[in-house]
Design a protein with these regions (language model features):
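Pocket-lining segment of extracytoplasmic ligand-binding domains
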Residues: 174-243, 249
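Short beta-strand elements in bilobed, periplasmic/extracellular small-molecule ligand-binding domains
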Residues: 58-79, 138-139, 186-202
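Hydrophobic alpha-helical segments within soluble ligand-binding/sensing domains
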Residues: 122-164, 263-283
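Short, low-complexity disordered leader/linker segments with a strong preference
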Residues: 1-30, 56, 88
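Extracytoplasmic "Venus flytrap"
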Residues: 31-57, 68-77, 172-174, 226-229, ...
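Beta-alpha junction/loop-to-helix N-cap segments that form part of ligand/metal-binding clefts
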Residues: 68-130, 224-239, 243-247
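An alpha-beta-alpha
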Residues: 32, 50, 140-187, 289-304
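Flexible loop/turn connectors
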Residues: 251-303
Length: 304
């Protein structure tokens, strides 16, 4: 009788232990860092989409996720500080835009903390992925491929007689350099010449606009974080000379650009959130190839 009782007690104890372990696993709370390079609508939409994508997969703020959100305000020094802090405090880091992704990757490399990036235009050029789209490190994410050819067709349809397109770009942003190169390669096919003006900081934009705008028929934006952050300045300068500005995504069109064949950043962020969920569930980020945005969304501002 005692042996049977002992066996029953042991069985119950094992069941309770297993139940407690399962409950502990289910109730695990993750600290996720969201490190955003700059304050503008494209990156804001990425951030919100990322949170939505995680929620779709069952990772909900206040239930099993705590978010730490910081913005570097396009300051490279602050970018490094945020990345290092999150590498220490977070279980996973979502890095928004190329400079922040590179900083987070470097900060998390030794610890092996996963980095999931988004709004990175060329992960291979940024050294975040190999030619197959993967990595030996714990990093993956999503790529905002600018539909350059579609944008050139759009500009031609709006401006049938235009010859020169102006592009402002930040010389330290590898994403902008990659996009500019693609514009230069394809422009001739549509009868355009690209006139580019490089800047170092947002403070350079007014003078760059004053020099560039008289030389061109219009401007087109890249997914350049500094330029997009100063879009109001660019639009003021261009409007004063009657030169249209074409955006690189829908929010820029809402804010005054004439039209765009650009990226839809909420959807891009949602995809990034779903990828982050895979990593939280045990996948090694480097084994997941980065995902590129699909095509572009044409939008037009009838008030411009």
């Amino acid at each position: 009788m005692m042996k049977k009782l002992t066996a029953i007690v042991l069985t119950l104890a094992l069941c309770l232990t297993a139940a407690c372990m399962a409950t502990a696993e289910t109730e695990k709370t993750y600290t996720i860092g969201i490190a955003q390079f700059a304050e503008h609508s494209s990156l804001d939409n990425c951030r919100e989409g990322f949170i939505q994508g995680l929620a779709e997969m069952g990772y909900v703020e206040g239930e099993n996720v705590t978010f730490i959100v910081q913005n570097a305000q396009a300051d490279m020094g602050l970018c490094q500080q945020i990345a290092q802090q999150m590498a220490q405090e977070c279980d996973l880091v979502c890095a928004i835009a190329t400079p922040m992704a590179q900083a987070a990757f470097n900060a998390c490399m030794d610890s092996g903390k996963p980095v999931i990036y988004t709004a990175v235009s060329d992960p291979v050029a940024a050294m975040l992925a190999n030619d197959e789209g993967k990595s030996e490190y714990n990093v993956t994410g999503t790529c905002d491929v600018l539909p350059v050819e579609a944008q050139l067709k759009l500009i031609r349809s709006f401006l049938p007689d235009a010859k020169k397109i102006g592009i402002l770009y930040t010389t330290s942003e590898t994403n902008s350099e990659s996009q500019l190169k693609l514009y230069q390669e394809l422009a001739g096919t549509y009868g355009f010449e690209i006139v580019a003006s490089g800047i170092s900081t947002g403070a350079d934009i007014p003078l760059a606009c004053d020099t560039l705008l008289p030389q061109v028929d219009c401007l087109t934006n890249l997914t350049d974080n500094t330029v997009v952050s100063y879009l109001a300045v660019v639009l003021d300068k261009a409007n004063a000379l009657g030169k249209p500005v074409f955006g690189s995504e829908i929010e820029q069109v809402k804010n005054g650009c004439i039209a765009s064949e650009g990226v839809e950043y909420v959807s891009l962020g949602q995809q990034t959130g779903r990828m982050a969920a895979q990593v939280l569930e045990g996948a090694f980020a480097g084994d997941i190839a980065f995902v590129s945005s699909e095509g572009g969304d044409m939008c037009y501002n009838p008030d411009v």
